């Protein structure tokens, strides 16, 4: 196997796909030729990043795995934090969670809030708190409101 080049990355499973299983071959081949990382994206109707990153980790041993980018505003921070921690451990520390603004027209179409820089900053803060073992109950900020509720 050639020496991996950490500064060289590829975009895995580009665009729309008929079969997400194609990613398994792409990742194995990228690792074989010495590519340092694979970046994975989401498409609301055909690609879900949590599944793809776990699959990439399962078929590689040295390839870095990153989202470029994930639609963080469509997931609860608890779900995103659990996903990030799980794939980080599953991959032996090779996972990086990339978040970004996405496309307003898609969020408008599904009724999700548009992403702002303030929301992204707040979301990252929530992830850091969760990864430190803290709670987000009672949080009320740009990334969302997570009140503490006992019963209903």
Regions found by a protein language model. Give the residues of each.
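Ser/Thr-centric signal marking residues that sit
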Residues: 60, 67, 74, 80, ...
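Alpha-helix N-cap and loop-to-helix initiation/capping positions
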Residues: 18, 22, 48, 75, ...
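A short, GP-enriched loop/loop-strand-helix hinge that lies immediately N-terminal to
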Residues: 64-70, 96-97
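Short amphipathic alpha-helical segments at helix-loop
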Residues: 37, 68, 108-112
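N-terminal beta1-alpha1-beta2 module of alpha/beta enzyme domains
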Residues: 1-67
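Internal, glycine-rich beta/alpha segment that forms the wall or movable "lid"
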Residues: 2-3, 79-152
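Active-site-proximal loop/turn and secondary-structure-junction residues that shape catalytic pockets
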Residues: 14-16, 44, 71-73, 101-105
């Amino acid at each position: 196997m050639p020496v991996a080049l950490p500064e060289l990355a590829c975009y895995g499973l580009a665009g729309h796909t008929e079969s997400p299983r194609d990613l398994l071959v792409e990742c194995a081949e990228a690792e074989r030729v010495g590519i340092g990382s694979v970046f994975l994206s989401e498409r609301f109707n055909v690609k879900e990043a949590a599944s793809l990153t776990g699959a990439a980790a399962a078929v590689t041993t040295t390839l870095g795995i990153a989202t470029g980018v994930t639609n963080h505003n469509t997931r609860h921070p608890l779900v995103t934090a659990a996903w990030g921690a799980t794939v980080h451990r599953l991959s032996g520390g090779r996972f990086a969670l990339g978040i970004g603004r996405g496309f307003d027209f898609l969020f408008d179409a599904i009724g999700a809030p548009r992403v702002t820089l303030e929301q992204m900053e707040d979301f990252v803060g929530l992830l850091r708190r969760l990864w430190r073992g803290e709670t987000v109950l009672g949080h009320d900020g740009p990334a969302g409101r997570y009140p503490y509720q006992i019963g209903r």
